[in-house]
Amino acid sequence: MTHASALGLTQHIPDTQSERDERHLAIQRVGVKEVRYPLTVRIGEQLSPTVASWSLDVALPAEQKGTHMSRFVAWLDALSASGKPLDATALRDELAVMLDKLHAVEGRIEARFPFFIRKHAPVSGVSSLLDYQGAWIAEHRAGSGTTVWCEVVVPVKSLCPCSKEISDYGAHNQRSHVTIRAELMEPPGDRRRPPPPGGGESTRERPVVDSAVELGFEALVRFAEASASSEIWGLLKRPDEKWITERAYENPKFVEDLVRDVALRLNADARIGRYRVEVENFESIHNHSAFAVIERE
């Protein structure tokens, strides 16, 4: 068989997923998940390469049998190959590109990945990287517009106020995780970018801010670290260990204190809309964790 004849046969392969469906059931979300693909994220002023676990989906009308599954990966490959750094503004734009490629009016992108921030120890100033978990989530729904969320998981140190109060010396302390999921809002009056296909902007302020004032991972990390008994570092010298031990002892926090203090910082930032903050203490005197959650809708 010649290449030309093989090409001719390919052109007549039926496209089953594009057929009409008669069951009259729309699908809210259909797509691919747990797709590992490289990307570049913007952390402050730095561009950081990483590998993300992607979940991509669109809404499917009742009359359409299936979506274009291969186009999700095609879109993702093009994004990765472009080298474009992913921040909130870029994510919003890329969601519109994905929806157009799949001929969809609603859809969602979620990318979860590790990232690093270089930190300097509090006394010695020695430099090292600390790893965090981050996520970008963007969703467009007809009638409510586009929302973009930034999520971080920040490791910190907490020390128990009760243990300090009742003990002659020392107090139990542990590593804690602060998880912040924040909706990024754009400034009032900024309406320069058109909505993705399907329209339907909400009467609420559309999420995502201009790049000059955009809030990202580094700011959310600082909200968590500044609220803890002490932040932590990847590399420390003895004077640094002394400083952290004494800093935590002088700044005890219950899990309730920590989650409230983080929430207060989020409340004070006009760039943040809805949010969810969860703190988990990996209790050093128990074989279980303590946790607290605050949500703003």
UniProtKB/Swiss-Prot annotation:
Keywords: Hydrolase. Residues 1-21, 180-207 are annotated as: Disordered. The keyword Hydrolase applies. Its EC number is 3.5.4.16. The record marks 160 as: May be catalytically important. It is an enzyme of class 3 (hydrolase). The keyword Phosphoprotein does not apply. It catalyses: GTP + H2O = 7,8-dihydroneopterin 3'-triphosphate + formate + H(+). Pathway: Cofactor biosynthesis; 7,8-dihydroneopterin triphosphate biosynthesis; 7,8-dihydroneopterin triphosphate from GTP: step 1/1. It comes from the Bacteria. One of its GO terms (biological process) is tetrahydrofolate biosynthetic process. Pfam families: GCHY-1 (PF02649). InterPro entries: GTP_cyclohydrolase_FolE2, GTP_cyclohydrolase_FolE2/MptA. GO terms for molecular function: GTP cyclohydrolase I activity. Belongs to the GTP cyclohydrolase IV family. Converts GTP to 7,8-dihydroneopterin triphosphate. This is GTP cyclohydrolase FolE2.
